[in-house]
Amino acid sequence: MKQFLFILLILFSVDLEGQDCTEIYLIRHAEKDRSDLKNKNPHLNKLGKDRALKWVEVFKNVQFDKIFSTNYNRTIETVKPISLDKKIEISIYSPSKIDYENFKSKTYGEKVLVVGHSNTIPFFVNGLIDNEVYQQIDDLNNANLYKVTICNDNITHSLLYINWKVFRNFLSLL
């Protein structure tokens, strides 16, 4: 009987630890206005504004605790619809000043969204997983969704490609 109780205690302890998982979702900003190549801080174009609204649908069932964005028009405009929908303030971060261990510590047990750039998001993921897996995103690709899950010492990661053209075509059939 004592062995049975011990096994139950172990099983419930493992289950409780699983509740402290951190989920970090990372996306690149949506399509930017490329009409002025000298503009270092462009706004989103029409397609980008549409994509920003589609991200709201993608994250409909995710209850974020925090939302992070770089301090650029295109990243803030990408995440603003999600921020408004979830009623969560956007926190500004600098990708060149990230301490990944500190970030993981401050977001422990939370669901977090991070929005950045083609040359920062893959490296942010690599920093979180402490492994060089992901490369810079192609400049015309605004469709990657990375997810990092940290449960105690177990880290899993994945990359999804959200093809809006296929998604829009599918919706038109409904």
State each model region's role:
Residues 1-21:
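Bacterial Sec-dependent N-terminal signal peptides
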Residues 24, 108-116:
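Generic beta-sheet signal
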Residues 6-7, 32, 117:
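Short amphipathic alpha-helical "recognition" segments used for binding
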Residues 20-106, 121-124, 131-145, 150-156, ...:
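Active-site-proximal alpha-helix that buttresses catalytic centers in soluble enzyme cores
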